[in-house]
């Protein structure tokens, strides 16, 4: 797989992962809570779902949510998960912009390959930071919810967060490790061909040795 293809795949993976993190942050179906069986809880209207921003009651004829806006009394796992997920969503804007400008198909005026490489590395590091925030939040939240009240199953929002964090990790790793290195850029001048006026044939000798040879001819 060529470098351009790897970078494009890393960008697309990071973009889809960022969308997954946004969906997980905005929705409240992180965990499903119930003290009894699923059928019993639905009949008694005690089947609930909990997210970062609200706690809902779910039944066949009712879906009512209560906002979790009492910041001072909220558990630490909810407040920390909120902060990490919001930070991941915000960091997605500059990181994806950097990665997009580092793609080989995007050309900026008076831009060197070294500057493009540094931009790809910085964008990849920010995407890995997004992945770390998503992983910590989506792992800590269900553990905290289970300790606070009986956890029955995981919600769709939590799965979206897991998928988003995994895709961001994959995309960030590809952008950081597969975007080409400075060593390749440094080797480019030494691979040039020099031509002698007398022989007219290509010579791949280093510049200093080739010039010395032409001086003695």
Where are these regions (language model features)?
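Short C-terminal domain-edge/linker segments immediately following a structured domain
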Residues: 52-55, 86, 97, 115, ...
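Generic structural motif
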Residues: 59, 89, 196-198
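Intrinsically disordered terminal tails
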Residues: 1-50, 105-116, 150, 154-159, ...
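Amphipathic alpha-helical interface segments within eukaryotic helical scaffold
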Residues: 65-110
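A surface-exposed beta-alpha-beta supersecondary segment
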Residues: 27-82
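Juxtamembrane "helix-exit" motif on the non-cytosolic side of transmembrane helices
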Residues: 144-146
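Alpha-helical transmembrane segments of multi-pass membrane proteins
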Residues: 10-25, 84-99, 119-142, 158-174
